[in-house]
Amino acid sequence: MPQVQRNNEMMRRAGEKEIAYLMRLAENDPDNRKHCIHMHARFDHEDHLCMVFEAMHQNLRQALRQHGHKRGIQIDAVRTYARQLFTALRYMERLNIVHADLKPDNIVVNDKYNLLKVCDFGSATNPDDSEITPYLV
């Protein structure tokens, strides 16, 4: 599933930063077991930065709307998703990566609904590179 970034310098820098995080996540997870989306390739097309990711079916918001809108999802599915999400969060913490935009839209599931992956690392950051602010946002 290709993703195209807008053609301007700020978007290119953001895309390159996201790619750096995706590569770091993949390098430390060669068996693809940590529930973070894997990027298969990156390329430029007509001055646009493009990324190709492993195929997933839909995001978690869509899956919950489709399969749990009236009564929720089964507790076993909640356990499975929670375990996989905590695995991803623990892995990102170990690599000192803060996702910074974790929401159902940025969590994807496969077509069997038994595998969950965190995606969209465009807002990710390293807490050591950030300034601490006394203000709440």
Kindly give the residue locations of the regions a language model identified.
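Conserved protein kinase catalytic core
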Residues: 9, 24, 47, 60-61, ...
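Conserved HxN/HPN-centered segment at the entrance to the catalytic loop
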Residues: 29-41
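Anionic group-transfer/hydrolysis microenvironments
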Residues: 5, 56, 122
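Activation segment/activation loop of eukaryotic-type protein kinase catalytic domains
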Residues: 108-137
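Conserved beta3 VAIK motif of the Hanks protein kinase fold
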Residues: 1-2
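The N-lobe alphaC helix and its flanking beta3-alphaC-beta4 segment of protein kinase-like domains
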Residues: 6-30
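Conserved alphaE helix
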Residues: 34, 46-50, 55-113
